[in-house]
Amino acid sequence: MTDVALVALRCRTSDRTAGPVRGVDALAPLVGKRLGREPRAIGSPGEPHVARWDEDLRDSRGCLLEAGGQVEDALTAGRLPVLLAGECSIALTTLPTVLRHRPDTVVLWLDAHGDFNTPGTTETGNLSGMALAGACGAWDAGLIAETVPEDRVVLAGVGDGGKLQVVG
């Protein structure tokens, strides 16, 4: 079996309900048992609330950078990073980090939404609805210099017909 670095990201990034962190807390011990690894818990849950993308980006900056750092550390050590997170904003730092280490990687984005909004196109202001666009460099989150080339991304399960995501 591949050596796995299992990380449970418990910090709030753009959660609008308590469900995402509860999901991480429920899955982490189960995945850890299955992999024979104790998950490393990062952060503590914040109070879920509705905030604009720029507020969430500012408030979750440390968690997002830590998520990218966990991927960096795992790949540098020759380990497979497995991150459990409650929502998509972590893609802002994790996906570009993976592509820096493994440029031949193809991202399979399995989501009901494309998450390809930008600050200029979002109708809801939800940071998670902008995650893939930010990772691909369609807008600058100010977190990481590298971006994911759009031709390295495959969308699957997008239920909105490929239109920009509307989260609400």
What are these regions (language model features)?
Residues T2-G168:
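Conserved alpha-helical scaffold segments that buttress catalytic/binding sites
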